[in-house]
Curated annotation (Swiss-Prot):
UniProt protein name: Leukocyte-specific transcript 1 protein
Gene: Lst1
Species this chain originates from: Mus musculus (Mouse)
Location in or out of the cell: Membrane
Membrane topology: Single-pass membrane protein
PANTHER family assigned: LEUKOCYTE-SPECIFIC TRANSCRIPT 1 PROTEIN
Lineage: Eukaryota, Metazoa, Chordata, Craniata, Vertebrata
Amino acid sequence: MSDDNGSGNNCTTNHFLLYGSLGLGGLLLLLVIILFICLCGFSQRVKRLERNAQVSGQEPHYASLQQLPVSSSDITDMKEDLSTDYACIARSTPT
């Protein structure tokens, strides 16, 4: 009878260790699968953005986005007004 006392506790401890390690391994596997799915989605998003960037060409310069209506006859008649120049405005404003 004394033979079973030690082996009973040892058996339940082994079961806890076995099930605990299996559970931990399962959680790690689940984590790897979730990270893989997120990485695939991120990769597809990057490829789509790269494809859209290639289709649209280079990004337009901010000055070209202003779309100021100026006809070609106005350009030839227009004299450069230095009072609107940034350096001129910066010099005339007190600091």
